[in-house]
């Protein structure tokens, strides 16, 4: 079994990565492989609602959306991580997920999913809610934890200091593993 995780931060080794890594390492202890897919900082287009993607994938082939979709279709579960900007998921993450789910959302039905939000302080709950809506409309069961799936940290490395947040990530991984093994 394998879980594909999306790092929605432009910072490849920032706090969002660290939260996802914590989930992944616990998954590994549960006997489940994982991969962290980095969106990166390259330009990313918004969905234009052309509808052509339902036939051949997203018509924009100059970024990572179609690559992610191919990997996501092979994965057994998905975890999406976002940094929080102005009490909301990053615009890059939303544009990316809009295109992923518009073009391929039905392919993910019955795969468990989870979202992780990382912020200095506020906005994580609102971001968590927005991210989980992608799962809800795509017939995907949502994995939770012992608290909302969030971690606090502003500058890279601060997430390490959020003991409760890191424990929440490990608990999330255990719950996701349980769902995958059912």
Predicted regions and their residues:
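Short, glycine-/small-residue-rich phosphate/pyrophosphate-handling segment
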Residues: 91-92, 104-149, 164-167
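N-terminal beta1-alpha1-beta2 submodule of the flavodoxin-like/Rossmannoid cofactor-binding fold
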Residues: 1-103, 155-182
